[in-house]
Structure formats: C-alpha cells, structure tokens
C-alpha cells in the first residue's frame, strides 16, 4: 500500500531529474556558443566548434574560464600581438594534484588544450613538448 503511494512520486521525481539534466545540457551548449574565441589570424570560433574535433566532442565544464585563453582573447580583440606567455601556480595546492607556488606549469590539456591550439594559430610558437610522440628505442 505504501509502495503504491510512493511510486507515482518517484516516477515524477525521475521525470523531473531527467528534464533538469536535459535543460542543463541545453543551457550549457548555449553558453559555450557565446564564448566566441579569436585566434591570431583573426578567425573566430565558439567553444562548441573548437571542441567538436576532440574525442569528447563537447567542451568540459569551465572551458574558456582559464587565464591563458582570456589573456589571448583580450590581446587579439585589442590589436595586441603576444610575444611570450607562461603560467605559474599561486596559492595552495589542490587536493587532486601536486602544485608548488611559484613553479611554472603547462596549461591543462582537457580544457585549455583545444582552445589554445586554435587561438595560437597564426603565431610563431614552439611545438608543445607534451604532444610529441615518445621516442621508442
């Protein structure tokens, strides 16, 4: 008897959760479409277009919010030409990885990698040593 009373509410809860998930995904895609990134050639793409060629095909949460893409975006939209850039860690190390304050680290590969590969097109940059094929004797 109690099960009969709870079942309709559980079904409604499942339906609402599925609707929330669907609406959230749709909103996220609309937000990513608003991130219009410019590269050194003057070409513009949104985050959905940039990440379409990646294995996951969709931008991860937080994509476009890191410092390097924001700094490059400002430079390219302000007629500036970046000469050099480096990222260093400041603050406490996150629990998920070891970071030392003041040390230089590469940009993250999942969020920034695809964005930076697009944005740096048209600049003379050194090859990314992390993307080189490993030497196998």
Q: What are the residue ranges of the model-derived segments?
A:
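Catalytic cores of nucleic-acid editing and processing enzymes
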Residues: 1-137
């Amino acid at each position: 008897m109690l099960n009969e009373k709870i079942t309709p509410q559980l079904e409604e809860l499942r339906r609402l959760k599925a609707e929330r998930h669907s609406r959230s995904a749709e909103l996220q895609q609309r937000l990513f479409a608003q991130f219009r990134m410019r590269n050194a050639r003057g070409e513009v793409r949104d985050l959905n277009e940039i990440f379409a060629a990646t294995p996951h095909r969709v931008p991860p949460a937080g994509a476009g919010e890191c410092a390097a893409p924001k700094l490059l975006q400002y430079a390219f939209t302000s007629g500036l030409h970046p000469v050099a850039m480096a990222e260093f860690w400041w603050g406490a190390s996150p629990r998920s990885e070891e970071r030392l304050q003041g040390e230089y680290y590469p940009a993250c590969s999942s969020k920034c990698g695809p964005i930076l590969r697009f944005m740096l097109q048209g600049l003379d940059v050194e090859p990314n040593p992390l993307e080189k094929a490993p030497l196998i004797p």
